[in-house]
Amino acid sequence: MYIYWILLGLAVATEITGTLSMKWASVSEGNGGFILMLVMISLSYIFLSFAVKKIALGVAYALWEGIGILFITLFSVLLFDESLSLMKIAGLTTLVAGIVLIKSGTRKARKPELEVNHGAV
C-alpha cells in the first residue's frame, strides 16, 4: 500500500515542477521550460493514475491538487517574487484544513465477505 502513497507523492512533485516550469518558460528565453512542463505534467498524471488504484480518488485528487497549490504558491513567492497577501494565506489555510477533513473522513473499504454457495442437490 505504501507504494501507492509514494506514487501520489511523485505525482505531486512532478505537478509542482511542471507548473513552476510553465511560469519559468513564460519569463525566460527558449523552449526548455515548455518541454520540461510537458514531461512533468505528463508524468504527474501517469503517477496519479497508478496511485488511485488503491487510494480513494477524492483523497488522492484533493492531496494532489491541494498540496500542489500550496507548494506552487510558496515557490512562486520565493522564486518569482509573487506577493503573498493575507487573503492568500487565509485561502491556503482553508485549503489545508479541507485536505485534512477529506482525508480524515475517508473510511477504508471493507473486504468483501466470502459467499458460501450451497448448491442444490
From Swiss-Prot:
Subcellular location, record wording: Cell inner membrane
Keyword Transport: yes
Transmembrane stretches, start-end: 2-22, 32-52, 55-75, 82-102
Main location: membrane
GO terms classed as biological process: glycine betaine transport
GO (cellular component) term, any one: plasma membrane
Family membership noted in the UniProt record: Belongs to the drug/metabolite transporter (DMT) superfamily. Small multidrug resistance (SMR) (TC 2.A.7.1) family. MdtJ subfamily.
Physiological role: Catalyzes the excretion of spermidine.
Protein name listed in UniProt: Spermidine export protein MdtJ
Record organism: Escherichia coli O6:H1 (strain CFT073 / ATCC 700928 / UPEC)
Gene that encodes the chain: mdtJ
